């Protein structure tokens, strides 16, 4: 498979096998960590391949909502990628199927979203997205929810609620454009 095909499988279907193959071609987990360090992200790190990276192990394979939004801003809205590559990346995120019950679910008709949902095996669900409200600059949002006593459906409900709050803030003009 080509890099483009692997990337599309990862973005649209969260294909872990494609993620492993693409990560191997890019220098493995340490290559990904080196890449985000080059973006100025001192928090995000990759230590293991899927599916082991989804098993909680302290500081291994981690990021934060602020760190992922900062890196995503540079990749999706900055000059890290060529315009055509940025457009393909965002189109793949827009086509993402696994995020349908998270932030995407909360957005009004006419808002464009490209997202990347994730979760670990037992207790954490997350989603980050580029959101394009009508007549506004694009915005980035990231939600991480960790609750060992809640199943995936319950965690997704919390992420949807966070998405609803985000929409209200945007509609009220309380979210500043920082692009």
Language-model features: where?
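Conserved catalytic neighborhood of penicillin-recognizing serine enzymes
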Residues: 1-21, 29
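Short, solvent-exposed loop/turn segments at the edges of secondary structure
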Residues: 5, 13, 63, 123-125, ...
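Short alpha-helical scaffolding segments that buttress acidic/His motifs in well-ordered protein cores
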Residues: 6-11, 22, 35-36, 72, ...
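Active-site-proximal beta-strand/loop segments in catalytic clefts of secreted hydrolases
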Residues: 11-14, 22-26, 47-51, 116-118, ...
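Active-site phosphate/pyrophosphate-handling residues
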Residues: 17, 66, 129
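Mid-domain, small-residue-enriched loop/turn segments at the edges of structured enzyme/sensor domains
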Residues: 20-80
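Structured C-terminal helix/loop/strand segments within mature extracytoplasmic catalytic/sensor domains
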Residues: 25, 70-101, 106, 112, ...
């Amino acid at each position: 498979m080509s890099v483009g095909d692997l990337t599309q499988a990862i973005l649209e279907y969260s294909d872990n096998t494609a993620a492993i193959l693409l990560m191997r071609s890019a220098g493995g987990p340490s290559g990904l960590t080196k890449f985000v360090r080059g973006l100025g992200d001192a928090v995000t790190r990759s230590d293991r391949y899927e599916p082991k990276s989804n098993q909680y192990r302290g500081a291994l394979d981690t990021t934060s909502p602020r760190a992922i939004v900062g890196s995503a801003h540079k990749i999706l809205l900055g000059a890290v990628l060529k315009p055509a590559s940025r457009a393909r990346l965002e189109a793949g995120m827009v086509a993402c199927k696994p995020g349908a019950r998270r932030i995407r679910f909360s957005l009004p008709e006419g808002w464009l979203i490209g997202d990347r949902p994730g979760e670990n095996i037992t207790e954490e669900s997350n989603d980050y997205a580029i959101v394009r409200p009508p007549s506004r600059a694009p915005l980035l949002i990231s939600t991480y929810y960790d609750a060992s006593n809640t199943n995936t459906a319950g965690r997704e409900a919390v992420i949807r609620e966070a998405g609803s709050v985000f929409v209200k803030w945007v509609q009220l003009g309380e979210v500043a454009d920082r692009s």
